[in-house]
Amino acid sequence: MLVFRRNYAKRNTGSKFKILPEYKLKCGLEIHTQLNTDNKLFSMSTNSPFADVDKPNYHTSYFDVSIPGTQPILNLQAVLFALKLSLALRCKVSLNSHFDRKHYFYGDQPLGYQITQHYNPFSSKGKLRLYKDLDSIEEAFKDISVIQLQIEQDTGKSVYNSTDSNTKIDLNRSNVPLIEMVTEPDFTDLKQIRAFIKKYQNLVRHLKISTGDLETGAMRVDVNLSINDYARVELKNLPNTSSITNAIKYEYNRQVNMIEKGEGDQLKHTETRGWTGSETVKLRTKESIIDYRYMPDPELPNILLTNEIVEGVEKTIPTLPDDTCMMLMQEPYGLTLKDAKILTINSNGHDDLYSHDELRACYFSTFDAYHSLCKKQNEEFVRKLPANWIIHELLGNLNKMEIPLIKVSHILPPEKFAELLLLISKKTISNASGKLLLSHILNSFKENSFVASEPINFNALIEEFELHAVSDVGSEELELICESIITELNNNKMIEDIKSGKKKNSIKFLVGQAMRISQGRIQAQEFEITFKRLLGVEP
């Protein structure tokens, strides 16, 4: 039996997983999102569940540890964050919602109940749309319906020690504000689920209401799954996206296997299962379901809103990522989907160097400055140049040199960056020389060689380092350089592969050698055209 389970788990979580047409998958998600408010939900304790991890019970107040006589005071910042998310998800906001007590006993919940919104949630009936182009799903678009959003408090954390049988309780996380978002069972494949989680993470980060990190527990996902309308199975203990998808794969195959063996009767009762990392295991069934004895919380007044408040908050919500992404792919920007996503997807990987708000602002300002400069000097406007240089060249240098974008903007503001782009588009300097110039400026700034108050003189730097593009080079000179490279390379196989089209990109290697010889002062396109002509490759 043990061997069967191991092989079964390995087979289920493999890359060949497939939803069978005769066994239809229906999934819904329950997502708990920690809000990054300044204080906790019902107390003035600092809301820093991931800070001071070596100091358990440090960020706590009398209410957080349930000292008798203490009462909850609602944090209005949490209400504001919930309202922003509700509006972004197009939910119907309840103008009169209230809190309820969910009773159960566990060590990390010293109150003996959790304050949540069971009977009258904060908002309901929303949706989040997924797109084929933006989210890599199979359908042209897919609407995922949101049943409700509710505000509730997080629990403390149980810490297990393997050296003894004691369980320790850390209440730093106790009373941290949460939003629980529940979807309809609208998901029918894994691509939709992955896309939704990624988009929801991006949304809460964009609204600046949560870090959205699964790994730290700032966002926690439970899955409700059924096959062919058998009873719902809830999957818990899913710490990251791979766990979520692997647990669904395993559970889908487990249930299909049971149905095919004639054991479908065992799937007629609602069940909660946990994910161990290799298989799902039963936690409880409908027969052992907990009676939480919900009741309205008598110590908290209702949350009363007005249409004017809702409309006022709606005006403060920034343009949503999907709208920004689509705008960037249209005129006048014309970006590729990949570049547009880089400017709109909010990840936490580079927070110490730049925020995506700063990155977008840098792009838009530089784009406008470059466009104005081209118009003023009657030069050709190359619309993709700002994105190419900000996303690929500037960010690459910032990450390598670990320089914050906000500091670079002091010496290389959008107007100055636009000057550099104009020098490149006018072919005053080549792309390669432009890269050297940008790298030199950033490196000099890092080493305090540049003073922010003194504007950069690009022409002086070009003269100093002899970076002027060679514009009067003839075709014969280009051919001599290219022919010498082909001869010295002495690699007939590579040349034949380029000619036959088997390895077209190998010509980039030849161009790189030519750029090295010319010290980057001749445009790479000139060399590429010459190589293709010499080798008889279609341009």
From Swiss-Prot:
Listed GO MF terms: ATP binding; glutaminyl-tRNA synthase (glutamine-hydrolyzing) activity
Subunit structure: Subunit of the heterotrimeric GatFAB amidotransferase (AdT) complex, composed of A, B and F subunits.
Protein's recorded name: Glutamyl-tRNA(Gln) amidotransferase subunit B, mitochondrial
One GO cellular component term noted in the UniProt record for this chain: mitochondrion
Gene: PET112
Note: This protein may be expected to contain an N-terminal transit peptide but none has been predicted.
Family named by the database record: Belongs to the GatB/GatE family. GatB subfamily.
Enzyme class: ligase
SMART domains: GatB_Yqey (SM00845)
Domain of life of the native organism: Eukaryota
